[in-house]
Amino acid sequence: HTQRRRQRQMCIRDRDVYKEISDIFPFHASISAEVVGETAEEMLDMAEDLIDIGPNITIKVPCTPQGLKACKELSEDEVNVNVTLIFSAAQAILASKAGATYVSPFVGRVFDQSFDGIGLIEEISDIFATHGAKTQVLAASIRECYQVAQAFKVGADICTIPSKVFEKMFTHVLTDKGLEIFDKDWKKLQSELGTT
């Protein structure tokens, strides 16, 4: 009971954060609000506290039998669900069949185990396309810029990326060099026209 009480307190604290994010970005398509619990009932109890925050709240559950049971119930009530901790195509299939709006394969963590994280995104995307699944593939645990491009190339619908990767996506040595050349040419032109 102590753990359940602690989980409930965390959920209330997280609820305030999710509410604040939802208020700042009211038209954002989806904000994933994670629930925890050992049983589907515990997850559903926490989800109930989060659903009414706004229409852009998506309930995030783990890819476990109890998480998929909660996913099934939530999706039947037309609540968007993100099934997370996906490490195989088989798990993604189960989540999709349970009504998941999104599945979140963990690209970086798959690579950590010497498997092909991008290959996993491609396999899931191909299976979903073949069967006309409505579930979207959300590539998670992205750690490098190239993984973003590759994930989208092989069929990811969405990528969640840390801010350091997002910032690196803007940077390229040739862009910096090009800006230096433009600046130098502009100063030269101003000098020639006598406008400096």
What is each PLM-predicted segment?
Residues H1-I12:
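Single conserved hydrophobic/aromatic residue that forms the stacking wall/gate
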Residues Q9, L85, Y102-Q113, A156-T175:
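Glycine-rich phosphate-binding active-site loops on the catalytic face of alpha/beta enzymes
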Residues Q9, S32-T39, N56-P65, N80-I93, ...:
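Catalytic beta/alpha-barrel core
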Residues R15-H28, E48-I53, S96-G99, K153:
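Acidic (Asp/Glu)-rich catalytic clusters
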Residues R15-I31, L68-V79, G117-V137, D183-L193:
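Alpha-helix-loop-beta-strand connector modules within alpha/beta enzyme cores
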Residues E42-M46, A70, S88-A98, R143-D157:
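Catalytic cores of alpha/beta
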Residues I53-I57, E73-N82, K97-S104, K153-C159:
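Glycine-enriched alpha-helix->loop->beta-strand junction motifs that scaffold or abut catalytic
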Residues F128-T196:
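C-terminal alpha-helical cap/extension of soluble enzyme domains
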